[in-house]
């Protein structure tokens, strides 16, 4: 057995020493064949483990958020759960959450593009939010245009096979807004990280805003939306509200616009948005493990 191949296989696949050694022995040092065998075994053993572990509590994990402004104003946020903080920090788990989030975004983009071709939205995409149910999420393909691509449920099983904990796909939502608006995002937690365009944390939020005065460039609008998303994570509002209705309650209000602004206590959120010339169109907040 080639020891250099063993080291490379362990590093690139994340599998243990004994599994990688077994793969290389069976494949007679054919690296590609050994890697393929490992992934087949991981999926097979993962489904077996998943069936055994499915009753175990999984309330830890990560929130993943991606916002894309390049071709359309589109954001996706998902929750993926595991049993322990230790696994939530594992590279394989983080990669899984990244894949689930980016797949959710691609799924929504594909629907919008198909509807645009059918002229269902005319020339403009109006503001939409869509909750994706767990069973729908499980049946999404990593490459949504490829019918032979792996299902997200199979990918979850593979990671269960590697990490040995119960892992569950949780909530998922997408927000789409028209070209004049911008979606901002924010994540928070004890180990916030980022992979490619995806940000991860224990808490996450997306906020869609629209300009109500001229002269606000897109980058400034995005910065304002990100600040408002930070407020949403920290203060947990339930509704947007009308603004000016309960200023005396300050931070006690559940209406976003009536809350004391997290980054400037001299203003309510409503006063801040009026001052900056923006209007909150929509927001959504996720907390990992929350009902």
Curated annotation (Swiss-Prot):
**Compartments, record wording:** Mitochondrion
- Entry keyword annotation includes Membrane: no
Main localization is mitochondrion
Q: Which domain of life is it from?
A: Eukaryota
GO BP annotations listed? mitochondrial translational elongation
Q: A Gene Ontology CC term for this entry?
A: mitochondrion
Gene Ontology MF, one = translation elongation factor activity
Q: Which UniProt keywords apply?
A: Elongation factor, Mitochondrion, Protein biosynthesis
Q: What does this protein do?
A: Associates with the EF-Tu.GDP complex and induces the exchange of GDP to GTP. It remains bound to the aminoacyl-tRNA.EF-Tu.GTP complex up to the GTP hydrolysis stage on the ribosome.
Additional comment: This protein may be expected to contain an N-terminal transit peptide but none has been predicted.
The record's similarity note reads: Belongs to the EF-Ts family.
Q: Which PANTHER family does the record cross-reference, listed alphabetically?
A: ELONGATION FACTOR TS, ELONGATION FACTOR TS, MITOCHONDRIAL
Q: What is this protein's name?
A: Elongation factor Ts, mitochondrial
Protein species of origin: Nematostella vectensis (Starlet sea anemone)
């Amino acid at each position: 057995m080639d020891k250099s191949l063993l080291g490379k296989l362990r590093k690139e696949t994340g599998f243990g020493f004994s599994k990688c050694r077994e793969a290389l022995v069976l494949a007679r040092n054919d690296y590609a064949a050994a890697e393929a065998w490992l992934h087949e075994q991981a999926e097979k053993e993962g489904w077996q483990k998943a069936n055994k572990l499915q009753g175990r509590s999984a309330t830890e994990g990560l929130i993943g958020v991606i916002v894309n402004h390049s071709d359309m104003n589109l954001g996706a946020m998902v929750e993926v759960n595991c049993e322990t903080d230790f696994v939530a920090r594992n590279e394989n788990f983080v990669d899984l959450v990244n894949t689930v989030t980016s797949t959710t975004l691609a799924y929504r983009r594909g629907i919008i593009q198909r509807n645009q071709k059918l002229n269902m939205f005319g020339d403009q995409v109006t503001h939409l939010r869509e909750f994706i149910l767990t069973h729908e999420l499980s049946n999404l393909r990593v490459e949504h245009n490829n019918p032979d691509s792996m299902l997200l449920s199979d990918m979850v099983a593979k990671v269960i096979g590697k990490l040995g904990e119960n892992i569950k796909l949780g909530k998922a939502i997408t927000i789409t807004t028209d070209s004049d608006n911008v979606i901002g995002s924010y994540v928070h937690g004890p180990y916030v990280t980022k992979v490619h365009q995806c940000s991860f944390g224990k808490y996450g939020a997306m906020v869609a805003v629209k300009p109500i005065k001229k002269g606000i460039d897109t980058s400034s609008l995005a910065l304002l939306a990100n600040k408002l998303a930070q407020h949403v994570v920290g203060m947990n509002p339930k509704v947007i509200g009308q603004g000016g209705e309960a200023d005396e309650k300050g931070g006690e209000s559940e209406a976003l616009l009536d809350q004391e602004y997290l980054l400037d206590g001299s203003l309510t959120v409503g006063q801040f948005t009026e001052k900056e010339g923006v209007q909150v169109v929509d927001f959504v907040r996720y907390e990992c493990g929350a009902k």
